[in-house]
Amino acid sequence: MRNKVSEMSGRDAEVVRVVVSPYRICPLGAHIDHQGGTVSAMTINKGILLGFVPSGDTEVVLRSGQFDGEVRFSSGLSSSAAVGIAYLLALESANGMNVSPLDNIEYDRLIENGYLGLRNGILDQSAILLSRYGCLMRMDCKSKEYEIIQPREPQNSDKTKIQKSYKVLLAFSGLRCALTNNPGYNCRVAECQEAAKFLLCASGKAEMDPRLCNGEYFHLILFSSFVILQLIMILIFFQTVEEEVYEAHKNELEPTLAKRAEHYFTENRRVAKGIAFLTWSFEIILEIHVYLVLCFINLWIYFIGSGLEAWKSGNSQDFGKLISASGLSSIYNYECGSEPLIQLNEILQRAPGVFGARFSGAGFRGCCLALVDADRAEEAASYVRSEYFELQPELASQLNADSAVLICKPGDCARVI
């Protein structure tokens, strides 16, 4: 990259800077970022490379190095956010500006919402800017609070099959259509807002911004004092008012709006189950046998997610099941997808070694993603190529055989190197 930019610009390779802006996947939390929901995401080792040389003046000269990358345009991996962030980081670096990731998330949201006209949330930008290698990023899109969560390392005594190393499989459909040209995406966002407006009116909060996250939070603070240990637990029961209101009034909602709200609330619960980001406090309480607290823990588990702390415990199988459940909700409640994408998703579900699969991105075109046993990734990729060609020969023939299904590893955050 440095040599190519050096040739184009006539400058020494030593002064060339390179932005690495990775693509992202969203295992859980699809289509709820624009409603202020809680999302999860990680980056992969594929993305945008942007080489540049600071010019010292106000002129910007752009040239294309190549368009022969492995990942096709409109693939459902957030390429628009990756490009926007690459430009932001390059321009900031060239001008000696130090901009925080949270500010850049907002700047790129303005690019997507204002310039491109796409009514999406902040999931894509947050994943690209905040992710860390091998970790899952969790973000509350209402408060913008986030956490980087690392799965538990298998212990020597772990003999279970659930703690397997994984890779990410990306299977491309061959469908290409810009989201700004497809009314389906923005229409779904509007329907979510209509559902939120109805539910807020039903709960006497009509003045609030019509997003499904809006309502009240209930904070419960428990304090236990011991000779050595002082334990402060803060349990936040998520969106209790909204879900109670939804359950009470969902039969009054127009059926389409009820489906959108159902996807939002169930997807929030799947994120919580998949991540279980307060597992540590539960383990401490078990050890000290605070039985009164355990009564409240039962309520906490109801909202945060029960038993199998999938991601944090390294349970790829249960985490994969949640991914697949999220995909089904995207099809039946959010009603995105198309026949080729749904077929591709079903093929991935049957593929050897796959823990779970779903659409990637908006789910109107592009690709499907799967979490797959690292030892069976090649076998799964071969199976998907063959099966998809049988069902969709015309679309499959448009794909490069070598990149129709990609085997990816986790990536890192966007950065200048």
Regions found by a protein language model. Name each.
Residues 96-146, 357-360, 407, 411:
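Alpha/beta catalytic cores of group-transfer enzymes, especially the acyltransferase/condensing modules
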Residues 91-101, 176-183:
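Inter-helical turn/loop segments and adjacent helix faces that build the functional surface
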Residues 37, 43-46, 77-97, 369-372:
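DPxDG-like acidic metal-binding loop motif
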Residues 1-28, 49-69, 135-358, 370-417:
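C-terminal nucleotide
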Residues 37-57, 131-132:
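Structural signature of FAD isoalloxazine-binding scaffolds in flavoprotein oxidoreductases
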